[in-house]
Amino acid sequence: VLAPGSFTADKHLGAQTYDVTALVRDGENELLIALGDGWYRSTSGVDGDRDLFGKEVAVLFQLEVDGKAVCVSDSSMEATQRGPIRQNDLQQGEVYDARLEGELSGWHGVKTQPNTLLITGMNTVPI
């Protein structure tokens, strides 16, 4: 899914809302997010330029239950680059290694920094 679409990523942080009610269960839940290069870092234009808006992918999220934030992105999060999606690009496609499915390993801490961009709701249908 190419969400949230194309926008000026150097000025705005595109935001979308997802209804995950059917996925939340009583007890402990796990939230996994797969980030791709998308419009932010993919090859663009006839020159094949990359990283037009930056080199590092990032996520800002908040999970709410009954209108109350129960999980917010922060420095306690962990990340890994060892999943089955090895490479992805809007023009060059995706390299997927099915041998790595379910083998997420190499978790490490994440770098946090304050958001300085204007959070902008995207004009796309929530998924």
List the predicted regions and their residue ranges.
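Accessory beta-strand-rich segments of carbohydrate-active enzymes
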Residues: 1-102, 107
